[in-house]
Amino acid sequence: MSSELLEELHWDDGFAIPVANEENKMLEDQLSKLQEERASLQDQLRDYEDRINAMTSHFKNVKQEFSFTQSLCKAREHEIESEEHFKIIAERELGRIKDEIQRLENEMTSIREKKSDKENNIFKTTQKLDGLKCQINWDQQALEAWLEESAHKDSDALTLQKYAQQDDNKIRALTLQLERLTLECNQRRKVLDNELTETLSAQLELDKAAQDFRKIHNERQELIKQWENTIEQMRKRDRDIDNGALALARIKQELREKENLVKEKIKFLESEIGNNTEYEKRISVADRKLLKCRTEYQHHETNRNQLKDELDSLKATVNRSSSDLEALRKNISKIKKDIQEETARLQKIKNHNQSVKKKLKQITEKTMSVEEKATNLEDMLREEEKSVKEVEVQLNIVKDVLFKKVQELQTEAMKEKAVVSEIEGTRSSLKHLNHQLHKLDFETLKQQEIMYSQDFYIQQVERRMSRLKGEINSEEKQALETKIVELKKILEEKKSTFDLLESQIKKLHNDLYFIKKSNSKNCDEKQFLMTKVNELNLFNDRSEKELNKTKALKQDLMIEDNLLKLEVKRTREMLHSKAEEVLSLEKRKQQLHTAMEERMEEIKVHKTMLASQIRYIDQERQNLSAEFHERLSKIDKLKNRYEILTVVMLPPEGEEEKTQAYYVIKAAQEKEELQREGDSLDAKINKAEKEIYALENTLQVLRSCNNNYKQSFQKITPSSDEYELKIQLEEQKRAIDEKYRYKQRQIRELQEDIQSMENTLEVIEHLTNNVKEKLSEKQAYSSQLNRETEEQRPKLERVTKQCAKLTKEIRLLKDTKDETLEEQDIKLREVKHFHKIIDEMLAEVTEENAEIHIILQTYFQQNGLELPTAGTKGSRQSSRSPSQTSLLSARSTTSVASQTSIKVLELNFPASSSVTGNISRPASATTIPSNGKNKKGSK
């Protein structure tokens, strides 16, 4: 057939059969390469998307597990706290009940004793009454006789009457006392009954509360068990994920081993790879450029990370400096306020001092007695002492407040330093982990690129092998021509069988019509079921929304319950703190009382010492005055003696007489000496008197201090103004403390939220940057591929047009409108190539995933087919001979394809597997579908 066609075209025998020229072959090779690169890039993109999804899901699972463990820990802590709290309450309640029982027992014993005493008294009084009644019920006749006998004794009768009245009064008093005691006994019994009923009701309430607590405790235990089960399940899932990762690593290792085997086999094909040296050189140049770009990228990335770290450190320093500046501003404003207050106080003190000075001047100017001056001075001193005390009290208060604030500031500074150090540590660890993650991503990218390059190289080698095996020599051409002659004879024989097959095809068409009818019915049923499924999905969505609403309501109720518990706990803590404060105040009161008593004893001792000193000074003063008088008397005596001596010691005659001036000077000198001694003694006396006066003043000051000290320990009455001021200040303090705690709690919560949000933001920014970079690279690469495909598209259209033109010319030459044998042979080869690609894809997928291998094997066995493997792929390539590519095989396969229908295999994978969809495969490798062009397009 082909020889006749070539003869009609006047084709010379020396030329080969027309095939595609070198340019078209190169274009086809480039197109196939681009398509393969596009497919590999799409697979790589899907792989990246799967990895991102896996990482996000793993991150969500980790987050959820962390939140679950945190909530479980909090629940455990709350449970322990509540159990301890209830234990303390139960112990207190037990102690209180024991005290109450002891008190009631004591009251019962006292009541029993009182009851026995009262019964004894009643018994005695009844005996007395009986005796009195017996005495009264004497014989009236004897009494009248006794009265007649004692009528003359009026005084005795009067006394008897008086005693009788006294006895009546005593009887009435005893009866009244008896009635009163019975009433009191009844009242006590009523009170006892009331107390018993109250205790019983309280006991019942306590039992009910205990039952409720046990119920709540059991519910909490069940909830915690459920949480623990969920956490255990999540851990199991994590273990399964880890096992899957290990299996994936193992499979990758096996893949690497197989790749090594392939490399060893490829060494045998080095003789056929001479044509690839130029491409390899280009690839090496491109690799060098890529390595340079990667090194530059790593350098830029390290610079960027360093700059980012510096920016973070600068931000931290700026934040720290701003916080320090704000703290300094606040301290400066506080110091300014304190300075203003102190200046105002100083101005007040100065004004007060000026007024005191004015008063002092007025007092000094006025002619007052010494006593009035002393009283004024004492009043002034008292006022000054009061003002000084007030200032000292205020100063002590300010000092205490300042000390507390300084301590709080120190603690807050320490906390801030600790938090800053923790933040810096976490940041450094995060940077280190990010750096490691970048390194690992870079290494994985390198390995994937190496794998993709090796796969591409293997595919090229396989294509070349197939081309080498599919080429036809001149000797084979002659053999084929002889076979064509033989096959023509066979064709005539087959035409008879063709008629039979046409009748069978008609029958099959009828069967197909009935099958289509049943298929349309099945489609209607499928649509009905799909509507039902959609309705069920809507119902599920609605129910899930309602479930979420109920969960939100439940969470709100739990939050309210926790808030109420916190409020109760806070009030209890406040109560305990107040009780502790009361105890500390009572201890302080006792300490102050003991200190006051010790101070009083010291003051008494000091008083006795001062009195003894005063007595001693008085004695010294008296001694000095006695010495002074003695010396005056001595002076008089000396004067007399002087006069006597002057008379006696007159100079004898003949000697010079000492003048009077000499003796006057001598006497004046002696007088001056005596005057000096007297002045010194007067100074000592004055000094002693001043010291006594000062000691008296100090004694008065001590007395006033002691009086004020006593008054400070007096209890404040509720009617006084100070009591109301104290209550107001306590309320203000309580409100301020509550506000302070609330603000602190808010600040802590906000800081925690900000920290968590910053961490999540950093992680998300890092992930988004990585994804954006990868996406930009892929987009650039895909745009490049699209440009290349757009450039190749007109060439492809031109080639398809040329092929269509040639097919039309060939059909016109053969005078046929149907497909020729050559076209069928070309389609057969295309289909075989398509089947080969599908087999390779299935083999690769089954090698990568064992689960998919099992599922595919079951589906293929159900449809009576064999699953393609790596071995069958190699055998299929090796078993392909030139004889199978001959026109004889083409004719036989076309005839069989026209008689048989295509067998479709539907694969429905479960949701857990990563592969979903339908895979259609022909019954055998030799079947040719009727729509070959569509197959080619789908490829």
Swiss-Prot record:
InterPro entries: CCDC39 (IPR033290). It comes from the Eukaryota. Residues 912-932 have a biased composition (Polar residues). Keywords: Cell projection, Ciliopathy, Cilium, Coiled coil, Cytoplasm, Cytoskeleton, Phosphoprotein, Primary ciliary dyskinesia. The modification Phosphoserine is found at S898. One of its GO terms (cellular component) is extracellular region. Pfam families: CCDC39. Residues 875-889 have a biased composition (Low complexity). Residues 16-124, 164-425, 457-512, 540-825 form a coiled coil. It is linked to Defects in CCDC39 are a cause of a primary ciliary dyskinesia (PCD). PCD is characterized by recurrent respiratory infections and situs inversus. A spermogram showed oligoasthenospermia: the midpiece is narrowed in around one-third of sperm cells and the flagellum is shortened in around one-fifth. Belongs to the CCDC39 family. Required for assembly of dynein regulatory complex (DRC) and inner dynein arm (IDA) complexes, which are responsible for ciliary beat regulation, thereby playing a central role in motility in cilia and flagella. Probably acts together with CCDC40 to form a molecular ruler that determines the 96 nanometer (nm) repeat length and arrangements of components in cilia and flagella. Not required for outer dynein arm complexes assembly. This is Coiled-coil domain-containing protein 39. It comes from Canis lupus familiaris (Dog).
